[in-house]
Amino acid sequence: MPQIIQLQNATIGYPDKVVLDHLDWEIQRGEHWAITGPNGCGKTTLMRTLLRLIPLRSGELRCYDVEGKLTEGLVTSYLPQISQIDRHFPIHVYEVIDSGLPDALKPAKERWEQVQHLAEATGISHLLGQPIGRLSGGQLQRTLLARALASDPELLILDEPLSFLDRSYKESFEELLSTIVRPETTILMVTHDLQAGDQEHWQVLSLGHF
């Protein structure tokens, strides 16, 4: 698979604080990376930089399209930590998924069919009419994953997707990723929960241990 992202001699952080320095990292299309490390080591700051929410302090961040040419924008989806979601917000599962669809001008019938397809793929068809406040942690995570996949992303960034989930949901979520995410989709997962047996499926970038 060709390269999708390259960080070269990158300094990452904020105007008053350097979080990561002299970072070199190359990511190929279709690779699955687990970003690990202690709290405060820069995992979230790195993801925010890749999402271009904060600028590089110095160095180079290059993104490449499917033909290997430099591009300013990748089709990227972000799955936040479920602890960041306001469960009291009055929105239903089908509305959450629909909000991830890229073309707001599509006919309502076509959008609904896409929502149903994504809900079926993530095993939440029976929950489409439920408000998010009634969902379990695992059900909410699947809802957010369906939304993230709605744009058919080239790059999928998962921020602590296994936190606050019990063991059975963790296993089912990992299995879900392997079955419904396209092989050519690149996945970056911030996690504290990577088990030794999972490391054969994930390349690991360990921060705070340079």
Regions found by a protein language model. Give the residues of each.
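Conserved catalytic motifs of ABC-family nucleotide-binding domains
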Residues: 152
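Conserved ABC ATPase "signature" region
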Residues: 110-127
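Catalytic Walker B motif of ABC-type/P-loop ATPase nucleotide-binding domains
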Residues: 156-160
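Helix-to-loop junction immediately C-terminal to a conserved catalytic motif
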Residues: 51
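Hydrophobic anchor residue at the start of the ABC signature
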Residues: 145
